[in-house]
């Protein structure tokens, strides 16, 4: 009986020790949440898209992440723009946003993560403006890790490449 009680308490502690206030900076490079579960191997029920295939350096585009059905809500995210392995650009998150916040992955506001998790804050669709650096040129891919629940998450879902054009 005591063993069952200890296991139950340990399970609750493990579930609440996931990152309830967003991804930590230590997740910036590999984008893997610190959950004691394996990455999903089935295709993600989410898309990451832009309305355009190119953007001028120094300009912004909207990046949209959507669940394919109303049941495909996001409890947590880590969103970055990458050129190769380098995290590039900056994100704008509204101060009124109850789901998201900027994250500094080596530079201010170069990633987006979730805020304190509460089931009623889960989202099916989110959108963020991304601004390309003024000196950037070439292809950028948007990558997102999506947490549906503590043990169900997908790492590094990629958008189609977006070409950053020089001035």
Curated annotation (Swiss-Prot):
Residue ranges occupied by any Reelin domain in the UniProt entry: 19-167
Induction data: In larvae, by bacterial cells or peptidoglycans.
Entry's Gene Ontology cellular component terms: extracellular region; membrane
BP GO annotations: defense response to bacterium; defense response to protozoan; innate immune response
InterPro entries: Ferric-chelate_Red/DefProt, Reeler_dom, Reeler_sf
Disulfide links within the chain: 28-105
Annotated localization: Secreted
Keyword annotations of the record: Antibiotic, Antimicrobial, Disulfide bond, Immunity, Innate immunity, Secreted, Signal
Pfam families named in the record: Reeler (PF02014)
Signal peptide from the UniProt entry: 1-18
Organs and tissues of expression: In larvae, high expression in the fat body and low expression in midgut, hemocytes and malpighian tubules. No expression in silkgland.
Highest taxon of source: Eukaryota
Function: May have antimicrobial activity.
Family according to the record: Belongs to the insect defense protein family.
Protein name as it appears in the record: Putative defense protein Hdd11-like
Source organism of the structure: Samia ricini
């Amino acid at each position: 009986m005591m063993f069952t009680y200890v296991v139950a308490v340990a399970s609750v502690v493990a579930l609440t020790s996931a990152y309830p206030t967003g991804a930590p900076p230590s997740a910036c490079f590999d984008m893997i949440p610190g959950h004691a579960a394996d990455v999903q191997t089935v295709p993600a029920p989410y898309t990451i898209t832009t309305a355009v295939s190119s953007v001028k350096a120094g300009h912004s585009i909207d990046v949209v992440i959507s669940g394919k059905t109303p049941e495909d809500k996001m409890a947590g995210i880590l969103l970055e723009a990458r050129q190769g392995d380098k995290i590039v650009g900056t994100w704008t998150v509204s101060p009124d946003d109850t789901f998201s916040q900027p994250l500094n992955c080596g530079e201010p506001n170069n990633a987006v993560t979730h805020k304190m998790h509460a089931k009623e804050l889960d989202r099916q669709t989110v959108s963020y403006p991304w601004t390309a650096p003024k000196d950037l040129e070439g292809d950028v891919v948007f990558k997102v890790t999506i947490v549906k629940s503590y043990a169900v998450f997908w790492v590094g879902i990629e958008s189609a490449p977006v070409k950053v054009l020089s001035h």
